[in-house]
Amino acid sequence: KKFEYIHVEHKLRDTSSKEAQDLKKMLKKFMIECKIITWKKKKNIKKTQSDSRDFRFKVFENYCKTKKINTILLGHHFDDFQENFFIRLLRGSGLKGLVSFHNYRNLQRNNINIVRPLLDFSKEDLFYITKNTFNFYIDDPSNRSLEYLRSRVRFMITNLKKNGLDEKKFKMTFENLISSNNSIEYFVQKNISENSSVSLLKKNNGKAFLSLEFFSNTDEIILRSFTKILQDI
């Protein structure tokens, strides 16, 4: 199958435009055509790392819709996965939010598959592969700036590793949380199937009927059940 390569140039740094062109030239040596999409935003509006990620994902999604592509491959690695977990923890995410970073998920609104094939590789692994395959690596200094939450979390994880939180223990904890989340999802589905019915008049226009037993569950099960039913109608 054909692959299309996209690099989003956010213009967050003075050197980013040159780096994007260097990347394009390097990939061309390997017969890879890379499309560069530049983020054009008003100068008086401050760009953040979070805004950049949101924009980048919209670019990928819109590009896939235009080109009728059904799968997006993202370059997230294990370090990203770990950082994302602690960022969500610091923001007060619930169990479902903490375990929502997966190798695969489907965007139902556009039926686009999101695949992260590199989650089992550390940043150090990928750095080694990149240097030895392409002899080329772009270092983003903002990754070390404590101005950004992700960088501060990265520093925190380094200290946690020194105190015993290695990759094996982290993955074990994450798998335990997934198991707990799956148990809750089981009872959510049970609650919906036994204590509710949905009548669809037409697409995105329907009614839901709930029995009193629907509300006899824990708050988390009731909330998740409500959310799923609302998505259906």
Segments from the language model and where they lie:
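Short, structured loop/turn "capping" segments at alpha-beta junctions
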Residues: 136-139, 165-170, 184
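AMP-forming adenylation/ATP pyrophosphatase catalytic core
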Residues: 1, 8-10, 39-41, 55, ...
